[in-house]
Amino acid sequence: MLSPKRTRFRKQHRGRMKGVSYRGNRICFGRYALQALEPAWITSRQIEAGRRAISRYARRGGKIWVRIFPDKPVTLRPAETRMGSGKGSPEYWVSVVKPDRILYEMGGVSETVARAAMEIAARKMPIRTKFVIAE
């Protein structure tokens, strides 16, 4: 699973997901991509599940680029704990994804293979996505 090697602070505020993504919204490396249509937190497990799904379907052919990285810690307090006594401990990492953000890119395969692989990866995501092709 993806996670930062070290961070400046252990815990973060939740923040808000306003507007669309102006960075990371163009295809840079491959020919085909999966683009987010909704805002969401995507966990490192979901990113890894999507990456595995694409690589399993494509087998040896092609190359995959994961364009998002989980750099936000999400804290949870233990079950059946009373309120108060500080913020919970960091449990997992998420990537803050806004609409139009490219999640995965693929190259070196045919469009039919890429479309099918991205469709499987899209099923692993908690948001609606679309398949895009570089101009």
UniProtKB/Swiss-Prot annotation:
SUPFAM superfamilies: Ribosomal protein L16p/L10e. It is found in: Plastid, Chloroplast. It comes from the Eukaryota. One of its GO terms (cellular component) is chloroplast. Keywords: Chloroplast, Plastid, Ribonucleoprotein, Ribosomal protein. Belongs to the universal ribosomal protein uL16 family. NCBIfam families: rplP_bact (TIGR01164). This is Large ribosomal subunit protein uL16c. It comes from Nymphaea alba (White water-lily).
